């Protein structure tokens, strides 16, 4: 029997995990100088990716190689809906969205303040998106973020506000998945919302938090999976090893990533949507 060590910090693992750990013949984990003696299959993480999957996923797949071998050659992932879900969401869109244009999903808020692009900047990007596509917009956010969303909407022009489809705001993870299946793209804060869209084969444009190393989480494919990070414009001020310093300066760093820096890339992506 084999056991794969979770890709988390050791301190977070309960003592019951370690008691069970001893009974496994094959123990697989990432190679570290202080844990190599525990595993009989130590995995050295690759540093560069020549595939379209980002490093964060490839590192986890590496843990399965001793068990599955070359069965991992196909690393694409897909999210599927039931026929009933497809029918229900299609009917909901027909009743809610005017015209025949598919909406654009906006990942309006990150999981926390450290992963949320300043809303005054996001408002500018939403305006650009509407001016470029004239498409309906859906805002994705958690209920606790409603006040910030209200602030965001107040910053928008009347025509853009009207394009916001409040009746289609997702109210659960599964609801988000089925809603995105009917959208033409997902744009905004990098995170789970963007990654789910990739699993549905939707074009995405992600704005990374300055504290996240994009190389581990993103693979650029023009007009398909695109992203921006402060390091693209100010590499001299970004040190991914000094995360504590970046967290302390998160607001200042975010404000440096002005929409004008990537306006051309943003609009170019939107113009290619179908």
Kindly give the residue locations of the regions a language model identified.
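Catalytic machinery of carbohydrate-active enzymes
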Residues: 1-274
